[in-house]
Amino acid sequence: AFQVNTNINALTTSAGATQLGLKNSLEKLSSGLRINKAADDASGMTISDSLRSQASALGQAISNANDGIGIIQVADKAMDEQLKILDTIKVKATQAAQDGQSLESRKAIQSDIIRLIQGLDNIGNTTSYNGQSLLSGQWTNKEFQIGTYSNQSIKVSVGSTTSDKIGQVRINTGAMITAASEATLTFKQINGGGTSPLEGVKISHSVGTGLGVLAEVINKNSDKTGIRAKASVETTSDKEIMSGNLKNLTINDVNIGNIVDIKKGDADGRLVQAINALTSSTGVEASTDSKGRLNLRSVDGRGIVLKADASEDNGDGKSAPMAIDAVNGGQSITDGEGAANYGRLSLVRLDARDIVLTSSDKPDENKFSAIGFGDNNVAMATVNLRDVLGKFDASVKSASGANYNAVIASGNSNLGAGVTTLVGAMLVMDIADSARKTLDKIRSDLGSVQGQMVSTVNNISVTQVNVKAAESRMREVDFAAESAEFNKYNILAQ
């Protein structure tokens, strides 16, 4: 038998549920989202909102890192140009560091170097990003947020690359050594990790000894100590060579012999020729300057010990000392006495740190007077690239070893401007090297930071994609499943 259902309440409830399901399904299909309101999935909405925020923050972090990379690239290219300038400065300083150059040609080279330094400073002062100067020393301790949460950042600093902040060179020169000794030195290592004891060297006038050998030992270890050395063993007489005779002239225990009828200022060169005839044995080379003064130079860095009897015919049968007996700043060599000059030791360090000599055997006896580095006997100075623009003063002249004997020291108190002297040109070479090392250090640090930023961008780009995918799976609708659900409710609603 047929039965007619008249449960209107049940039918109304069923129809309402069907319409609600149809409405929700249609909303999901039209928006493409599974979660359109908190009621759809409260916990899922919380998680997906968090993922969405994370993905958005990661997108901005990628932009931040790319901005940082751009800034670093601007600074790096600017410093690359500065390095090219420094290379040119060193080449020109090397060109000036030979005595084939006249004072005028050196002045021309100095003018070129001044222009180059001004160009370097112009780059340092004008390189900027978004109105911020990058190479003037003001752009330090900057941060770039490269993560989702606060303080996930990379710090960047760019040191100053202007001439007043780079090219520091520390120079020390000891007093002239006048007594034989033996030196065993220990230097602090360049990285501060310990000390580097050097082999002992005898300071005397025999072959294979002297400050020249000590300088070679120091230079062999410069990669560990950061210190280079130069020995200057040279003697100049105080006055013009006077006419007369030299008897029993001996240099470094090698008998030169008797030299008679020496002309004033050694006009005919007989004194110089006699000394140079035995240079291979004595290690000493002689010459006269424009004032007729005798100059003796050690060719291998050993000491110079000079002995002679000097006489001049005064017409009264008496003998008088010649000017040659006033060498080494006035030390007499008449009556067979010996005048000894073992030279001066100059040390160079291509940064502003002090040069520290120590002794691992006797740390309480670090006087070093035997090599001219005793208390209050050391000339010290620090110069930088900016100093090349002006004149090197008296302190720089002494510290660079230009005052290698008392006669030279009594002359012009200043070293001169930049490369206008041989010693100055060599000092500018060291300054250019030091400046290059400073710029290379800054560039390498920036390169490391740039590499870190690139790796970070690569990492968070992948992370962002995965976070977006996770958020999409949670928030977005499955069209196939939801279409089937919609069709079900649509059929029920008919």
Curated annotation (Swiss-Prot):
<comment type="similarity">
    <text>Belongs to the bacterial flagellin family.</text>
</comment>
<dbReference type="InterPro" id="IPR001492">
    <property type="entry name" value="Flagellin"/>
</dbReference>
<comment type="function">
    <text>Flagellin is the subunit protein which polymerizes to form the filaments of bacterial flagella. Important for motility and virulence.</text>
</comment>
<dbReference type="InterPro" id="IPR046358">
    <property type="entry name" value="Flagellin_C"/>
</dbReference>
<dbReference type="Pfam" id="PF00669">
    <property type="entry name" value="Flagellin_N"/>
</dbReference>
<keyword id="KW-0964">Secreted</keyword>
<dbReference type="GO" id="GO:0005198">
    <property type="term" value="F:structural molecule activity"/>
</dbReference>
<keyword id="KW-0843">Virulence</keyword>
<dbReference type="GO" id="GO:0009288">
    <property type="term" value="C:bacterial-type flagellum"/>
</dbReference>
<protein>
    <recommendedName>
        <fullName>Flagellin A</fullName>
    </recommendedName>
</protein>
<dbReference type="GO" id="GO:0005576">
    <property type="term" value="C:extracellular region"/>
</dbReference>
<keyword id="KW-0975">Bacterial flagellum</keyword>
<dbReference type="Pfam" id="PF07196">
    <property type="entry name" value="Flagellin_IN"/>
</dbReference>
<dbReference type="Pfam" id="PF00700">
    <property type="entry name" value="Flagellin_C"/>
</dbReference>
<dbReference type="InterPro" id="IPR001029">
    <property type="entry name" value="Flagellin_N"/>
</dbReference>
<dbReference type="InterPro" id="IPR010810">
    <property type="entry name" value="Flagellin_hook_IN_motif"/>
</dbReference>
<comment type="subunit">
    <text>Heteromer of FlaA and FlaB. FlaB is located proximal to the hook while the remainder of the filament is composed of the predominant FlaA.</text>
</comment>
<dbReference type="InterPro" id="IPR042187">
    <property type="entry name" value="Flagellin_C_sub2"/>
</dbReference>
